[in-house]
Amino acid sequence: MSSDLLCGSHAAPVVTQLRRHAPLVHCITNDVVQNFTANVLLALGASPAMVVDTDEAAQFAAIADALLINLGTLTRPQQQAMRAAIDSACAAGKPWTLDPVAVGALTLRTEFAQEILARRPAAIRANASEIRALTGESGGGRGVDATESAHQAREAARLLARRTGAVVAVTGEVDYITDGERTVAVEGGTAMLTRVVGTGCALSAVVAACCALPGDRLENVATACWLMKRAGEEALTVSRGPGSFASALLDNLHAQAFGGAYETH
């Protein structure tokens, strides 16, 4: 399966739309990453909100421009709020994104992820092991970490996209984004992104924000991946370790959104 390579010149129009529309993203995400996720969205010009009560989640999902469902610290009571929010978003015509953290490794979240896939997410952002688990392959990573490369899960991602109608982003050293017919690759980034808690979960929130934008959803989701990788590369050049890298990542995401300079490679 061949993949087209996304470069900065293709990402630039999507970044402009992100800044212009400033989508309101309803994040039902895990307890570990809420603050960092909110700051990443703000850095890019989007607006985050974390509404978790079941009744309020349903109300707010209809108001927001996009919804993120992240299974990182899933509990049975939280499932009710997630179902209500997804149903409300779907009824209002709002896109929702699934981040199926650690599916395949744990039973509760794996069964719940399979259940809500029937509600047709606009996008799915996951690592290789999670993508393979969603398709019923062996899957099952080491907790939240993948035990396979994104390249190994490209075909599973394509099949999952065809089955669900979602744009599927399988992320790793190289990210692959597919709608089941077309596939885009995003290269770059840095291993330091794996040394800061929440970068993957925050990326899923950016994917959700980009799903609210007009235009080609495949390119929109690929641009979300490009933004995180590019900002990570730039942050690495000015940081001394994970702590300073996290701050520099936010600064460089903001620079990508508001600086207006995009390389063609």
From Swiss-Prot:
InterPro entries: Hyethyz_kinase, Ribokinase-like. Substrate binds at residues 50, 198. Keywords: ATP-binding, Kinase, Magnesium, Metal-binding, Nucleotide-binding, Thiamine biosynthesis, Transferase. Its cofactor is Mg(2+). Its EC number is 2.7.1.50. One of its GO terms (molecular function) is hydroxyethylthiazole kinase activity. HAMAP family: Thz_kinase. Belongs to the Thz kinase family. This is Hydroxyethylthiazole kinase. It comes from Cronobacter sakazakii (strain ATCC BAA-894) (Enterobacter sakazakii).
